[in-house]
Amino acid sequence: MADTAPQVSFKKRSVKKTNFRKKPESPPPDADSDSSFTSSDDEEGHRIKRRRKNAAVSASSTSNTRRTTTSDEPATAGAAVPLTASNDATKHSNWYDDELNEKNLLGTTRARPAATGADAPDGTYKGAANYQSFIQKNPNAPAKTFGPIKAPTNVRTVTFMDYAPDVCKDYKLTGYCGFGDSCKFSHMREDYKQGWELDRDWEVSTKGKNLGGKVVSQRGGQAGEDEDDEEEQLENIPFACIICKKPYQNPIVTKCGHYFCESCALQRYRKNPSCAACGAGTGGVFNVAKKLNGLLEKKRERARQRREQAIANGEEVSSEEDEDEDEEQNSS
């Protein structure tokens, strides 16, 4: 009997039926009643009091206000700044304004009577303020302003005074520049004078003389008409070698028509076979410049004539030109 297990039975408890009160439906509140509470009676006589619910929903809570303020801040911070037209390019410089002069700001000390017409004098002296003008003025005449004239306010001028112009060193030493007309430096070999010195020299040179032409370019007489191709050729020939910056030693000429020293041209050809002046290929062809000495002699003669003419006119001659002439004569 010990092997038999005891039987266990579970009792299922039944759920007690409880009497739940059914809440009766409350009648709708009157629309005219102002009280926020409503009351109703149930079946057993108990009075139930309910709070009246507002039909309208108010959204004026603190959290909503904070959210609205926070959401509005980025919109205000990211708003585009309004652009204002400055018109700096066409801005006027009103240094003196007619509306802000002393007369309009301070006013006149004494108001003069309006000119109604000249009356016949009755012999009574009424003071200097009552003087009358019997001159009939033209009412249509424009008003005259006295004093300095007002300068335009919408015009800007930029003045650059170049007292020491940059001179091309290659052109000043040799008379040749590889850049040609595109060189940014001045191709000049003379000294510079102030404006009053130039005016003085012009007055001294033209005093008591009849000038040949009506314009400045024709006042040299027939000098401008005698220029020919030879003059242009002489101007294009450097008076010194552009490689060594010294007078020509055994000059040679290339196929492109440029002159160099023989030693300078051969030494350059070992490293660069192109022409030192124009960059064209020489091909190793260097001819003896037989006519160069004659051309340079003509160029020196014309420079000497111009120098003598300048001295005769009372003009100053650069000392560098004298040194160049001495060196050329010594080398020849």
From Swiss-Prot:
Gene Ontology CC terms: U2-type spliceosomal complex
Primary location recorded for the protein, binned into one broad class: nucleus
Region (Disordered), start-end ranges: 1-95, 299-332
UniProt xrefs under SMART domains: RING (SM00184), ZnF_C3H1 (SM00356)
Residue ranges with Low complexity bias: 55-68
CDD domains: RING-HC_RNF113A_B
Top-level division of the source organism's lineage: Eukaryota
GO biological process: mRNA processing; snoRNA splicing
TM region positions: none
Complexes and interactors: Associated with the spliceosome.
The protein, known as: Pre-mRNA-splicing factor cwc24
Name of the encoding gene: cwc24
